[in-house]
Amino acid sequence: MDSSAVTVKGLSLIDFCSTSSFKYRGHHELSESCSLNKKEEEPMLTCEHPETPSLGSPNSAVSPSQIMKSVSLRKEKDKSPELCETPKLRRKKCTLRRRLDFSFPLLKGDSDSQSRSLESNISQGVSLEKHLPGSTSGFPKEDNFSPLVTSTIKTEDVVSNSQNSRLHFSQHKTSTIEDSKDNCGLFEVECLSPIEGNDFKDSITHFSDSSLSVSDENTCPELLGSCGSQTTYGADVTTSVTPVSSLIAKIKFNGNQTLDSSGEVRDSLFTPEDSGFCSLSWDKSEDFLSDQEGSFQELLQKHRVTPKVGDQVKKPKHFGRLRRLSTLQEQGQSEDEMQTVHPNSDSGVLESLQGSEEKRGNLALSFKDLSNTPALQLVQELFMKSKRKRSQQEDDQEFFEDRDEGKIARLQRVLAGLIGKKMGIEQLDILTELQYRNLKHILAMVLESLTSESLYSAWNVSRNWREIVAQDKKANRRRKLYIIQLRASAQGAAVLRVQDAATRLCLLSRLALRSVQAQAQAPSGEQVPTLSPWGDVLTPVASSSLTHLRSKQEQYVKVARTLFTDEALKPCPRCQSPAKYQPHKKRGLCSRLACGFDFCVLCLCAYHGSEDCRRGSAKARGSKDVLPGSAQSKRNLKRL
């Protein structure tokens, strides 16, 4: 037996290659549509799917003429098929998706498993077809099925036919509930995505179901890798001829068992990195995550849980929107990636295997894959808001620490209207705070209550208070008047002390007796009562009898107690009472208040100041004058 072929037309091959898309009704149709063509030299098994089934008749009968036609077309085609554009089917309505939970465990046996007898498998297939009912009612999950067909075709043909199988697989789209309701076209320009080939780069990108995902745990990688197909189409008829290579030899139908997604199975995946299968797998994962409507943590937990059969039956609520989003993302990624991998080159296969492994390991659940999910957009927005708050807090901390004038001024403007910001401070400048708040009427009331001396003192406190007093015209006028009074009083005090100052400046010893001299000084300008030489207040009668009451010596002793160090006593030329005179000025003054003669010591005349004395009269008068205590004065006393 040289070779064996299996012809699967249209949608049945997609249901055959996809694990999670197998359902009970699909399996019944597959069993019913299988026809056996047995020859003596070259046995052949042909399986055909009904030609574009309508909604009313999903399972139409297959005539022998169609079987012969498919076989003849298979022989006429070359072994190296060419890639062609995806045909646009004209059917408007599609039946519900038929899935069957089958897994395709790999058989690692030797060539003995590939050389099984075709007759036994055919008999098993015939018996299986008899037992299956024609209705589409429920099919039990627990039944186990043995391989329908095995073939001994050489493994070299797998490499050439695998890419054609994937192309054929990607060009078909299974029906959904939404398509049946909306009566929408299945194949449109918007649903095409680039898949690299010989003549074109456009094909279906998004299949909107977990059955087309390479990363699904129920998908058999070798089945997807070993499928091959050729498509010939006309106006209304599409014919698919698929050779059965190691596909049947390595696949065993088991409805009760699921294939574990181990590293060994993933390594056997024969798909380049830029093929349609990788895009399907990642699109499926994105759709699965974008369907979630819960929180982000629930989304992560649901993504990590192994998908069950019941979960796969559920369809996305918004299938059309998700399909368009995935298609746009697929086109954007294909435009960015300009590198192409030849499907028949070994090096390209190895690089694609490594790239797909890295993609599954790193991009299994990343933010890039979840860019279409509303939950991730919400999480990213919250993260950016928290980041802005942290940066704002850091900026505020730097703002308080920085001593730049601009930033400090900005802070002062912000805190200017804060009430109670000065609480707890021991010393507070109330006038400055009132001026800062432009409360001039309150400042006017405060300054009006102050005295002129207080205003003068406030002027000298600080520059701010000086500005405050200067702004109030009334208070500033009072301050100026007080300054004028101070100056006038200072000049008057200086005039009063001019007479004593002339003598005091000559002697350094007067500094020690200044307090005593102040007591002897009598203020001028006021009416001083008549005093005796001893300081008693005298009436005019008492003053006339003064000479009679006291002796002249007692008078001299009384006046001598009030003399300064630079003064001396001398009798008055008129009344002979004790008179004080200053030797350096040559001027004398009678101590008796009734006389009070101011005279010149040289000429004994009225004091003439800087003018020259009259010498004659002075000498004559001088000859008569006798110094007290002299011999002449003693003789005069004796004579008296």
From Swiss-Prot:
Pathways per UniProt: Protein modification; protein ubiquitination
Modified residues (Phosphothreonine): 176
Residue span, F-box domain: 423-480
Biological processes per GO annotation: meiotic nuclear division; negative regulation of cell cycle process; negative regulation of meiotic nuclear division; negative regulation of protein catabolic process; protein catabolic process; protein ubiquitination; regulation of meiotic nuclear division; regulation of mitotic nuclear division
Covalent S-S links between cysteines: none
Tissues expressed in: Present in testis and ovary (at protein level). Expression is high in immature oocytes, and diminishes after oocyte activation. Expressed post-meiotically in spermatids and sperm.
Outcome of gene disruption: Both male and female with knockout of the gene are viable but sterile, consistent with the fact that the gene mediates metaphase II arrest but does not interfere with mitosis. The absence of the gene results in the arrest of meiosis I progression in spermatocytes at early diplotene of prophase I and is associated with a decrease of CDK1 activity.
Cellular component GO terms, alphabetical: female germ cell nucleus
Gene3D superfamilies documented for this protein: 1.20.1280.50, 2.20.25.20
Binding site for Zn(2+) 1: 572, 575, 590, 595
Residues annotated to bind Zn(2+) 2: 600, 603, 608, 613
One Gene Ontology term of the molecular function aspect: zinc ion binding
Keywords: Meiosis, Metal-binding, Phosphoprotein, Ubl conjugation, Ubl conjugation pathway, Zinc, Zinc-finger
Quaternary assembly: Part of a SCF (SKP1-cullin-F-box) protein ligase complex. Interaction with SKP1 does not occur. Interacts with ANAPC2; the interaction is direct, ANAPC4, CDC16, CDC23; the interaction is direct, ANAPC10; the interaction is direct and CDC26, during spermatogenesis. Interacts with CDC20.
Protein name, entry field: F-box only protein 43
Organism ancestry: Eukaryota, Metazoa, Chordata, Craniata, Vertebrata
